């Protein structure tokens, strides 16, 4: 029934928010095949046209803690994360907890809205390891020992931010 159909019942609710946060579990990939109902695996991607649903819902903030953001790399040997981040940027969406490398993935998303200073941080503890960003590859921020998150929360609170931390 079209790419916007899944948002039919929640559209007005989502659009009414000052900030709309969505956890998007998968990367966009231009070669993403149409879903096959007989496929029994757990390798996921989204056709770039599906960004229209996030636009329609008014998505502002995209969480990338998901463990399927690197599925395209595992199956097709293509790193689709940079393309995905460019697509978010083109659609004026900001993201956190994922990036082109581990430094980028661990960077907090800082937003000031209605007089509030918000800092979004997140990480993936679930894995598998191929889902995690490294010094040389894209993916979700690995939780590791959580010390880095504790340090960031302390630093950000000292700067007047309210940290919002998400985990998968």
Where do the PLM segments sit?
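Acidic, metal/ion-coordinating pockets
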Residues: 1-168
């Amino acid at each position: 029934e079209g790419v916007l159909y899944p948002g039919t019942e929640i559209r007005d609710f989502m659009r009414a928010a000052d900030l709309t946060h969505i956890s998007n579990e998968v990367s966009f990939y231009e070669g993403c095949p149409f879903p096959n109902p007989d496929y029994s695996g757990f390798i996921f991607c989204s056709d770039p046209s599906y960004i229209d649903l996030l636009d329609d819902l008014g998505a502002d903030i995209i969480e990338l803690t998901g463990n399927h953001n690197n599925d395209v790399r595992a199956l097709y040997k293509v790193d689709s994360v940079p393309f995905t981040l460019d697509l978010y940027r083109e659609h004026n969406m900001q993201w956190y907890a994922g990036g082109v490398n581990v430094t980028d993935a661990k960077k907090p998303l800082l937003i000031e809205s209605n007089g509030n200073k918000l800092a979004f941080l997140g990480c993936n503890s679930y894995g598998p390891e191929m889902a995690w960003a490294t010094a040389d590859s894209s993916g979700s921020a690995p939780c590791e020992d959580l010390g880095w998150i504790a340090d960031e929360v302390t630093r950000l609170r000292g700067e007047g931010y309210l940290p919002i931390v998400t985990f998968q």
